[in-house]
Amino acid sequence: MELSNEDRRGLQRAGAAASEYNATMFAVEEVLNSDVNTAWVGVVDSVQTGSGESSGVANVTPLVAHTDADGQSLPMSSIPALPYTRVQYGIAALIIEPVPGDRVACVSCKDDISNVGPGVTRPQRPGSYRKFDQSDSVIVGAVHTKVPEVFIRITQDKKIYIKAPAGYTLETDAAVEIKAGGTVTVKAPRVEIDAPKVHMTGDLDVDGHIHGN
């Protein structure tokens, strides 16, 4: 793609070469602008999930293109194997994997992080001498997201709403306890309880028929 004539501009400001100081500052700024990456926005091209339920990596193409001296945008290459973060501490996690087409915010690390892989908990030497390189970025979140269709909404009025159109499964190896200060309501066309024994305390009110063998 190419910028319009109105948007084209030189990289050197007026007066950059007016003094030795200005020329030096221009050279320093050029190094910072071209070699030091901080945070940037990209689009996910592909995702490789981690083994088991661990997080994985994604290939991401930057959405802001570099430009040449004529103001023309340059083709941007996909940056491979960027690790993505998730909400997790210890063994507790909220698992949501990125998908191709997601627009994500990435942060470039100071050093080469290629030696810091899954399971690494001790400091490692940098994988190379590169600094602030986009190849050493970490995906920290999504931006300009789509309208979600499955979600958990936590509101400031102390309520939680869960929407899962395709199904909802709660699995545990221990007991499940529901505590409510009011009525617990279950609305469904059919409710099945698969248990060898059902125990109830208190009164049982039934509107309708009770069938059994």
Predicted ranges, named:
Residues 2-180:
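Hydrophobic packing positions characteristic
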Residues 154, 160-163, 168-172, 176-178, ...:
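Low-complexity, small-hydrophobic/phenylalanine-enriched stretches
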